[in-house]
Amino acid sequence: MITTEKTTSRTAHLVELMTKGDDAFNNRNQATLDVIHHPDMIAYVTGNAQPIYGRDAHAKFMNQFVSMFPDAFVHTPYLIHFGTGDWITVITNVTGTFTGEMKLPDGKVVPPTGKKFDVEFAQTTKWKGDQLIEIAAFWDAAMLARQLGLA
């Protein structure tokens, strides 16, 4: 049974803010991200053993990601989006090329392979007013590793 539900104005507004944030990431516009991301945000990211606490720590993490994948790009409009209240989920693809060193937590460095990736990417977010306060970002890490020539 297929059901449809009208997008609420709150959900539509949050999807617009999320798009603005992903567009800012794509343009490497940290000032806009700082407006959208709450100072006390928490990020749960695939592959990280611990959550990332705070806007500044999240920005540092994203800068490390971009140093590995300088052309990383979150595609909009989203393939799927839905939400309720202060929560939304968006699903899209993220693409990029592994051209920068990958620094592992144990200090090892993985040299770039020059290989491209294209993986489905989901983000579930909670908003406090017009600021993102919590995010869980998901992708298939095994598929990403295979595409990068690491598995």
Predicted regions mapped to residue ranges:
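C-terminal and inter-domain tail/linker signature
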Residues: 2-151
